[in-house]
Amino acid sequence: MYGGDEYATNSDYYDDYAHTGDPQLDMEYERNYYAARMPDNVKYFLINFCQAIKEGNLYDIQNMYENTFPQISDHHFDKTAWPEEQEVAAIVDNDKVFLILYKELYYRHIHARIPGGPKLEQRINSFFNYCDFFNLIISAQNPVMLELPDIWLWELVDEFVYQFQNFAQYRARLTEKSQDEIQQLCVNHSNEWSILCILNVLHSLVDISNIKKQLEAISQGVDPQTVAGDFGKLSFYKMLGYFSLVGLLRVHSLLGDYYQAIKVLEPIEIHKKSAYSHIPACQISTSYYVGFAYMMMRRYADAIRTFSDILLYIQRTKQLYSTRSYQNDQINKQAEQMYHLLAICLVLHPQCIDESIQQVLREKNYHDAMFKMQCGDLEVFKSFFVFACPRFVSPCPPAVDAPMDDYVKDPMEHQLQVFMDEVRQQKDLPTTRSYLKLYTTLPLTKLASFIDPNASEDDVSKLLIRLLCFKHKMRNLVWSKGPSGLEGTFKSGSELDFYIDDDMIHIADTKVSHRYGDFFVRKILKFNDLNRKLKNINI
């Protein structure tokens, strides 16, 4: 194991007088000193990694990033940090760009692996390292000639937003901090990881890449290179711009601003595949936050479509990410959250979904919980929401003189209250729906007596309010076409419709029967394709 104890032992041999005053000799001395302390495979990995990034060798960079780095982390640094900057600098000739990228991985590893999480100083240093990276690529007069794999660019932006979220939660947890720590956080470090910094960086990446103009050009059938500009023509800037749009979606969702969350994605046709959606984790994260935003905006039909489409995608593409265990765990967790959210949406807005998704809901016993929710069990709604929602944050830190308390849960409890208020308005609607489905005509007084055998005239008046609520809640804004996910037309999503003439309810069943033909056609085509592949195999 390569850790702090080994450092302490080796440091006994450090000789201050070995420095000669000659910069070249001193650098050589430091290189040999730090290299002697590192395991050989770590040292050679860092040297080769630096060389691959210098040469822009994408294949080698991706292999070392996706495979070698996690393997060495597991073997040498499972619960400890990687070597610090000065140690690595000595063996990579102080390569500025590589050291910034290395520190991004270094602090990411600390957030993910070190028990107890990063210290305040490490959080602040990570923020300034991100600033160095973004200043390097945004403030340059000409595009920086840097090639990184798309998966690294996505995870870099995603980690940047995650560390903002993590710092906001750390900042809000006052009960675990001394008065000096609170003072230091609120006064000395009030600007680090601030929401304005995060939004500024993400919007700057979007602007410099001209990604919105490029996406609009693609939707109009125009060559995006004509509007990309000097920076946006490079894949490095273009993909950073695209991933920053998804980062903005996540940030606004964490703040509870669902309208703006969907708004920032306007150039992206959410419900269509694109050339930019080749990173599974990015596509899944996008759909999770879009679907959640739709649910909170009471656009249940769009939320159901978003969740169903991405869950089908996950079912069909598991082999793409199953080789990376940490990514597999993350995607499986997000998929589980989306099944919970889909179950909520189907209770509030029943409609037909793909049979394979229904099968998963049955196998995982979601139907029992869905039945309880249909019967008005608010605790099940609450537990499903708490499990599946994002970990919301407040854009502002607690006041310096705030009582010593844990403020982490405040944003989530506020969003939970908003959601539960909506659920309470709808909790009686499934009962009303179940009675209406049994009849084509039904007197108001008879329906009132079904709901309450001792119904009075006042109860009949209240029933009219409930029926009006049913009409209102079942009428949703539904996206049909166009680049804006906010647009749509009002449609009734209920399986039945009705109108009231005098004291008589006239009911029409609008339920669309299952289209089993499509299911069998897909299976036949899949079987034929498999049969062709088997015939082409040479044994």
Curated annotation (Swiss-Prot):
Instruction: Fetch the SUPFAM superfamilies from UniProt.
Output: TPR-like
Localization of this protein: Cytoplasm
The record's InterPro entries line, in alphabetical order, gives:
eIF3l (IPR019382), PCI_dom (IPR000717), TPR-like_helical_dom_sf (IPR011990)
Family that this chain belongs to: Belongs to the eIF-3 subunit L family.
Choose any GO biological process term that the UniProt entry carries and state it. translational initiation
Q: Which organism is it from?
A: Drosophila melanogaster
This chain belongs to the protein called: Eukaryotic translation initiation factor 3 subunit L
Task: Tell me which HAMAP family the record gives.
Answer: eIF3l
Membrane-spanning residues where?
Answer: none
Source domain of life is Eukaryota
Start and end of every PCI domain? Answer: 306-514
Please explain the role this protein plays, according to its UniProt record: Component of the eukaryotic translation initiation factor 3 (eIF-3) complex, which is involved in protein synthesis of a specialized repertoire of mRNAs and, together with other initiation factors, stimulates binding of mRNA and methionyl-tRNAi to the 40S ribosome. The eIF-3 complex specifically targets and initiates translation of a subset of mRNAs involved in cell proliferation.
Q: Name one GO molecular function term.
A: translation initiation factor activity
Alphabetical list of PROSITE patterns matching this protein: PCI
Tell me the subunit arrangement: Component of the eukaryotic translation initiation factor 3 (eIF-3) complex. The eIF-3 complex interacts with pix.
Range of residues in the leader sequence: none
